[in-house]
Amino acid sequence: RRKEIAMVKIEGLYNTAFCYTPVLEDAARAQIQSVCDQKEFAGCKIRVMPDVHAGKGCTIGTTMTIRDKIVPGMVGVDIGCGMETVELSEREIDFERLDALIRKEIPYGREVRDEIHALNAELDLSQLCCADQVNLNRAMRSIGSLGGGNHFIEVDRAEDGRLFLVVHSGSRHLGTEVANFYQDEGRRALWGGAHYQIKATIDQMKAEGRFKEIQKTITALKREHDLSIPKDLAYVEGALFDDYIHDMKLTQKFAILNRKAMVDVILSGMGLTPVDEFTTIHNYIDTDAMILRKGSVSARKGEKLLIPINMRDGSLICIGKGNEEWNCSAPHGAGRLMSRHAAFQALSMEEFQKEMEGIYTTCVVPDTLDESPMAYKSMDEIIDQIEPTVEIVQRIRPVYNFKASD
């Protein structure tokens, strides 16, 4: 008998969202409520994953079906972010040598490569509809670079001794440029010069002394231009929708190649042999099923996926069940227990060092305290919630971790 899963239901003016979590923070609830209150998203199936927490512009853990409108800000700036998981034939690795190789050959933080990686040949970024808004040279030199924040390179060991290389990274600054361009275009297309027109009208009415009429006029003008939708939820439709989908898919491919380039540098530099490899993506639109996933991953029937928990507990290798009620999706991690700012305030380096004992890492430093295991929800909390959408095949535990500070 399937056990009951804790769930929070959020009813809005035009839609109802289901969040697969026992507890929902107020900020995340407000963001989800805002989406459910927009008539433009009526009829979209909104399902929010157990690792839910408030994000910039949209709740992390959001999945929703889409039709002819998309909010670029909901996919976010790190388009195509995800994990490349590689099973290795080796059972032992020289971690000191690996760490030195990564620090020498893989740019991290805001750094990019001096030379472009050979995998650039598989992508033509000049085909982006917004190519003139993008620093193409920097983008090309970013393929094979890690970035900062929660991005990491890790070696994990399964219970049977097998080793897995996991690389978590995204589309670097290119994703930010593409996302910001389309979000701005969406705002312009929706509102045009409406804000300017309203301001000019108010100034004129004040000059004419018609103060009592101002509020009524503003309301009428706002209705005329439909300014009710929040700034963060400005959407694109029509030709802009098509252009965004085109550029998002290219940027998604860029992110995949970025991870594969880092894998290539590590495998060739260390002389390691891959046995199996799979990709798990968590900020994108699945254009086959027309499902938006923000901080959530695809879990189609039979699909292999990785759910990383934290840098102490490792990851879950899972097989999707294809649960339509969950939008064939799963969480992309454990989800944050506290914001980055709160983590820096509340957590200690002593505790961080103690929690990471037994794992080879040179990255347990004050700058990465916000990424410490204590800043995330527990593995048990996630395992309890995901039974309807995935089968856990195995848990892999970190033996090496590299995480850049920003």
Identify the role of each PLM range.
Residues 1-6:
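Short, Lys/Arg-enriched N-terminal segments with co-localized hydrophobic residues
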Residues 72-127:
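A generic, well-ordered mixed alpha/beta core segment in the N-terminal half of proteins
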Residues 63-64:
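Glycine-rich phosphate/pyrophosphate-binding loop regions near the starts of catalytic domains
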Residues 8-34, 41-48, 54-60, 69-72, ...:
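Domain-length cofactor-binding catalytic modules of enzymes
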Residues 52-53, 81:
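Acidic, glycine-rich active-site loops and adjacent beta-strand->loop/helix elements
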